[in-house]
Amino acid sequence: MTSNEKEMMNSIFAKIAELDYIKPDEIPNIDLYMDQVTTFMEENLASTKRHEDDKILTKTMINNYAKNKLLPPPEKKRYSREHLLMLIFIYYFKNILSISDIQTLLGPITEKYFKSMTEKDMTYIYQEVFSMEQTQIRYLEKDLMRRFKSAGEVFEDADPEDREFLHQFSFICLLSFDVYMKKMIIENMIDHMNSSKGDGTSKKEK
């Protein structure tokens, strides 16, 4: 591993270490206006930005989510704790899934848990999902090192001045293939959900 490659991997691991999810007890229990919502999201998800001037969520985005029924409409222009939890899910999903796919995923969650009066509410869903975070981060770090080593074992006969770039190119190709395959699996699962939903509807109609 060259000094440049070591510096790159240290930078990647430092970025991963900075990532954190919003803890349930950090989410306000009072309703917020739109400006307060965007400020809250901006402050608490800043570590996920690629560039400093990137926006986490804008008013236009949030209005579009409500218009497309990804998000229940606010009550008297105020957004509840449940709205914030839904927006966090949407924020992560929107980078890899289409609006219609997010609708398929979040529709049943909204219907059953959004205004639940039992202990199994949106906070329960959020806590259960994000409780897996630390385990996944540890796995990710080990997996990244394994893939980086694999990428460094190819192009052994390349010109020395090209080898470092080609190793990085191979590493990116490995990661991209992984992302592509996982995205395809997610889309297939969502298609199956849609298909099952359709079958259920047709059976009821019969």
Q: Can you say where each PLM-predicted feature lies in the sequence?
A:
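Intrinsically disordered, low-complexity, charge-dense segments enriched in Lys/Arg
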Residues: P108, K112-K206
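Basic helix-turn-helix/winged-helix DNA-binding cores
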Residues: T2-T110
